[in-house]
């Protein structure tokens, strides 16, 4: 079993139950899924850029991403409806815990001038969104093979009802929030 999953069952669940006075173990919030999304703006003129982004996302997540397409045409961006403009991957279960563990213990500390992630990025429903400016912070990405530095959005979806519960859950998992 994954290190974080074990920690969740043995340490985090009892801690959250006592802190928020839950009656049942099923009320304890847990991480439902992690969605990694990257937009490739230059895919409009250069289709090779999207292939590179998909390849990098596959290495980072360990799972093949799905290509996202434009919902509507925007003339200013030379964009037609249905054109491929990004990629996203949804992680659940074992892979989700592996990725989260890697993100918290390896990738985030590699960010330049890292002082912790913002406490304000919760959406009011207990989900946390994190923006990463470059894909080089992940250990799987080889610096020499990167054609262009790309950012990505990482959304951590929890079953928590409030932001306070979600923040406590992620803090227990080791998410480095700003002081």
Swiss-Prot record:
CC annotations in GO: ribonucleoprotein complex; ribosome
Cited PANTHER family: 60S RIBOSOMAL PROTEIN L11-RELATED
Gene source species: Bacillus cereus (strain AH187)
Biological processes, Gene Ontology terms: translation
Keywords for this protein: Ribonucleoprotein, Ribosomal protein, RNA-binding, rRNA-binding, tRNA-binding
Sequence similarity: Belongs to the universal ribosomal protein uL5 family.
A GO molecular-function annotation: structural constituent of ribosome
Complexes and interactors: Part of the 50S ribosomal subunit; part of the 5S rRNA/L5/L18/L25 subcomplex. Contacts the 5S rRNA and the P site tRNA. Forms a bridge to the 30S subunit in the 70S ribosome.
Pfam families registered for this protein in UniProt: Ribosomal_L5, Ribosomal_L5_C
Stated name of the protein: Large ribosomal subunit protein uL5
Role noted for this protein: This is one of the proteins that bind and probably mediate the attachment of the 5S RNA into the large ribosomal subunit, where it forms part of the central protuberance. In the 70S ribosome it contacts protein S13 of the 30S subunit (bridge B1b), connecting the 2 subunits; this bridge is implicated in subunit movement. Contacts the P site tRNA; the 5S rRNA and some of its associated proteins might help stabilize positioning of ribosome-bound tRNAs.
